Amino acid sequence: MNKQIRQEIFERFRAANPHPTTELNFSSPFELLIAVLLSAQATDVGVNKATAKLFPVANTPQAILDLGLDGVMEYTKTIGLYKTKSKHIMQTCRILLEKYNGEVPADREALESLPGVGRKTANVVLNTAFGQPVMAVDTHIFRVANRTKIAPGKDVREVEDKLMRFIPKEFLMDAHHWLILHGRYTCKALKPQCSKCLINDLCEYPAKM
């Protein structure tokens, strides 16, 4: 795939959805961090249902700590791996208060030092909460990048690095959201909706329909 085709792909994504964003509901960097921590192996819909009850009660590190672990788990128990995730949330809140005055740091190294926060989670927060042009690669983006040949790679980091290198700079801020939405609703794992795909003619997937 060449530079001109990638340019056209993202031109089309932008024309169809000029202001893409996450489907997780949040109103602060802290709320986004908690939502992303809960979202591993869970749906955004499921996370939003839990945080719709949790955030009105506790949406700061201190308020979460005041709830206590059992209190937090009452709100997160509908989500997979909720016990581990809730412990990570409690530990993260303590660190945010002790080291960062209760604020979420806008720095990758600091974010990745928090319990349960890996590179992907850090990138989501940096991009969505702080407007940094970074690329969080999840299962949807990994699939789309490889299937279309926008940025084929054997592992998540290779795909991330290629996307950062290949995507025209003007699209980098929103590319994560366009690709994840495309993978979630059009370029699905088992039944890709090729007939409805706005980049069908540009895609290099051999089995496209």
Map each language-model feature to its residues.
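Catalytic cores of DNA base-excision repair glycosylases
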Residues: 2-209
